[in-house]
Amino acid sequence: MADEMASNEAALHRLDRTLTWQGFRELLPISLFVIVFGAAFGLAATQAGLSDASIVIMSTLVFAGAAQFASLELWGPHIPLFTLVLTVFAINARHLLMGATLYPWLQSLQPAKRYGVMLVVSDANWAMAMQAFSQGRPGLGLLLGGGIALWSFWVLGTWLGLYFGNVVSDPASLGLDMVMGCFLLAMVVGGEKNLRMLVIWAVAAGASLLAYRYLPENSHVVVGAIAGGLVGLFWGSRDHEY
């Protein structure tokens, strides 16, 4: 029995080419919608005065749609660097929570591989990976392969936006902004349901609501992510100690 449990646990930590390719294929449908938003970003960045090369490089290295759109609002001859960094951090603070929830499965990887996987983590592949883990299936392939799919189509969409962005200048007008929200809601409903996840999300939600009420604007995203992330990190560490 112990050997079987150890074998099942080891399977959850698997990350190989087969699982990565499977993850790529599973995230392919949602990745196609990412092209539209990438094209919208390419157009918006062009209108903001960025060069074609810098636009594609930004999408390639940053891979953070909402943060990239927000950075365009601050773009100009004199870029307020501190404000830009703070804005990007606030928008992406949810990755602290994602990293905390993934910690139990990522910690067995070598550091280079672990951080390589985290470079392509976004909402969609994180949600699918967490659902897989909750069902006793390997999820790291979904995380890496799905992330590569999303990243590839984001960069491709950005490049297409340089030339054809006017066709999809406003994805929200076509209702496409609801696609990712509906996808994530479906993942949450079918995702992991245990005390650890309940406490993490409850703490994150409570801290975020308090910050929204009493702290400066937009700080609730950072506060909620840090609070939930710390709970997830501490709980994950305690589980592996015993």
Report the location of each language-model feature:
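Membrane-embedded alpha-helical modules
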Residues: R137-V223, F234
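Alpha-helical transmembrane segments and their membrane-interface exit regions
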Residues: F63-A67, A90-L97, F183-M187, S208-L210, ...
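Residue-level signal for short hydrophobic patches within transmembrane helices
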Residues: T20-L32, I57
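Helix-loop-helix junctions within the multi-pass membrane cores of secondary transporters/permeases
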Residues: L12, V85-S173, D177
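C-terminal ends of transmembrane helices
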Residues: L97-L106, M128-S134, A186-K193, V231-Y242
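Membrane-interfacial helix-loop connectors
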Residues: Q47-A48, A53-S54, M58-A93, V167
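The first (N-terminal) embedded transmembrane alpha-helix
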Residues: L28-F41, V62-F63
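Intrinsically disordered, low-complexity non-transmembrane regions of multi-pass membrane transporters
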Residues: M1-G23, G236-Y242
